[in-house]
Every structure is written in structure tokens, then in C-alpha cells.
Amino acid sequence: MLRKFALLAFLVMAVLAFTSAANAGSTVKIMTQNIDQGTGEGYIVAALFGQMPLPDAVDLTFAELQASHLKQRAGLIAEQIAAQKPDIVALQEVTLWRTGPDTEHAFTPVYDQLVYLLSDLLKRGVPYVVAGLNTVDDVALPGNRIGALRLTDRNVLLARAAFRWPPFYLSDMQSHIFTAALELGGLTVPSGWISATVHLGNQKFILAAVHLESTVPGYPPAIDVQVAQAQELLDTLSSATSPVVICGDFNSDANDNPTVVDYTPTADNIRAAGYTEVWGELHNGDYGNTWPLYLDDLIPISFPSQTPFERIDLFFTRGITALTADQVIATAPAGFAPPYGSDHVGVVATFEP
């Protein structure tokens, strides 16, 4: 009798363990992280508004890049990704910086944040592959001390290179550039997003990873562009019959704080279109601010620590359940500058298709 009872108890525990494993396998974990391109481009914007010569602004920007430890910061972010092990990572500001003798020949790579991050993840034994890449901008500007500085700005989707059950994969990967783009001092500044269908067993949903236009203090057209981009995103997704997850850097404060620089109607417009804002839903009353962890574009160049005052790194859902939402911060060692791996807090959410 005791042996029968022991066998029954063992079988019950085995079933519970199997059920728990199955439940764990039936969720998808997604992380969104703006990894900070190494400059807020404040010097360049000042030059475009006529506040300093453009070559001087380019020299300052390059000096800021040299001081921002892009390679080391990629390691800090990789450490957080390796700890969380999300199935998908949506990244913004994944930049490639190049220099050259002039703007027509700026071909020499100086910093490549994507290479740094993938290499660091591999070293940690948690490899990821590039599932989608959205080249948003590619512009070279003349300097004084350097001939030219070239920025290639990218949004990237990473997928974890690990077997899991039920079968997990991405399909229908698409790269999009918004029709609405910021015009600033003779430069066109585009923004973009990546979409994919995420499959888990016989379930699927659409993932849209976005980076909307940032605000420019004292320049209302930047907000108009951002609002138009968000509407274009919503219009594109409106015909989707599958559930939808939208994540990324929206540059719109979801807390609706009228005192912050990113006080725009975009987050509210997405809610009004029938989407649930995940952090607000799961952490009611917790502001969960994600930006900025430090300041940049200062003279002299420095990166003082800052308490975040707005929540712009977000998840929105339609027709799919978000189970959890947590924040991750890539803290640097004492005395390191900048004091964090990025000026943005990362957000990790788990979904059950």
C-alpha cells in the first residue's frame, strides 16, 4: 500500500513537473532596449539651428563617441540579455560609425555596436542571431579634426539561437521606413520599424518593433512627425487578423507628464486605437520611468547620472495576454563613464499567445 501511494505521489509530481515545463514553453519573452548610439546628437542639432558651425559640432560628436565607451557598454547590455535570456530582443540605435577623408569616402569602421553585442553574447554562451535589420539612416557630415563622420542607424531584431519546445520561429520579416520624416536644417531624418510573425507551436502573433521620431525642444514639427509615424504604424497593423505586440522606443511619455520633453499624444493615440499598454496594465500606479539614466551632449563632455523622469520604452498589445513586465538596467562599475550601459532602461515582457 505504501509502495502504491509512493508510486502515485511520484506520478503526480511528474505530471506537475511536465505541466510546469509545458507552461513555461508556451510563453514568449521579448526584450526591448535602446542601446544608445553614444551621442544624443545635440551638437549636430545645435549646428542645424545655426548655433555653432557644423564641422565643430561633428568634432564634438566624435569626441563624445570616443568618451562613451561603446564597446564596453555593449558588454554591460549583453550581460543583462544573457541573464534574462529573452527569445527575441528588439534593439534601437544599433549604430555603425565610420570616418573618412571626406563625406564621399567615409568608409573606415570605427564603432559597430551590433558586432560588439553579438560577440559579447557569444562569449557568455548565450548566442543570438540577427533575425531582422532595419537600416534607418546613413549620413556623413564634414568635420575639422576628422574629414567626415558617418552614422548608419539601425533597428535590429535578435532571436536566441537555442532549441525550444514547442517549435519557435519567426517568419514574414519586413523592414519599414515611415513615410513621415523629420526635416531639420536641410537634413531629412527618417525613422523605421521591423515587423515579423512570431510562431510558437500552432499559435502565432505579429511583432512590430519600432523607434519613433524623438522630440526636439522648441521645434513642434518633430511632434507632428512622430504622431504621423504612429498613425502610419496603426494603419498598417489595422488589417492584421492575428494578435499584435508593438514594442520599442516611442519617444512619447506613457505617463502623460506635461512637464517632460517627450510629452506627446502618441502613447494615448495607440491606446485609443484599442491597444493595451503593458506596463500600465500590470504595474498600475508605478510610473516605471525608463529615460534618461544619464545626460549627454554637454560641454565639457560628461555623462552625469540622472533619475529617469519619463516612460518611453513601451509594450502595447492587442488580442494577446502579457503575463509579466520587468525592467533591466545595465549598471556600470564604479568610476566608469557613462554610469550605465545605455541611457535607457530595458523592458522585458512575457506573453502567452
Q: What is each PLM-predicted segment?
A:
Residues 30-35, 73, 77-103, 158, ...:
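Active-site beta-strand/loop signature of hydrolases that rely on acidic residues for catalysis
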Residues 121, 130-209, 323, 330:
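A well-ordered secondary-structure block
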Residues 168-169, 235-245, 252-353:
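Metal-dependent phosphoester-hydrolase catalytic domains
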Residues 60-67, 175-185, 212-226, 254:
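Surface-exposed cleft-lining segments at the edges of enzyme active sites
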Residues 98-112, 219-222, 255-264:
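Short, flexible/disordered intra-domain loops and linkers
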Residues 22-143, 147, 227, 353:
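N-terminal, active-site-proximal structural segment of metallo-dependent hydrolase catalytic domains
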Residues 8-17:
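Bacterial N-terminal signal peptides
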Residues 1-9:
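Bacterial N-terminal signal peptides that target proteins for export
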